[in-house]
């Protein structure tokens, strides 16, 4: 049995699995390589989204209950930093319509990323709403700072390795118990603020 962390291996031993049958391999996401065309993809995204000269905050893998908190913070931050651009990526694509309604209710100008990729923006928006899978790595690389969701509520957080992999500073809420060891390592080296 190959485990990510020593505490997981200990759990298997507690269940009666013989120690020689257990190994600790670590998290394989740390070994992921960055695609060679990542910079080009980021440049294309920035151009299509009209955010080439913006300060970019990516709020990724957000859960129900987090977006309203993040949008409140965004409003306050934007008063101090008018060039701040929010890219909001709900964890589950089926929630995009609900998040879009929240954006309209709060009077934010928004656009779905899938539509921007079909026809680049002509006018800037307040929030870019990510509505398709497979886009986070280039968006993490494009961002100046990334919030990793599932951590403002007691969900346990999402994996913060991808933004750290591309050198983007990571912030999260207090509830990161699903990734305790990863978070501790990133906080210890100054790559993440919790």
List each model region and its residues:
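Nucleotide-activated sugar donor-binding and catalytic core shared by glycosyltransferases
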Residues: 1-194
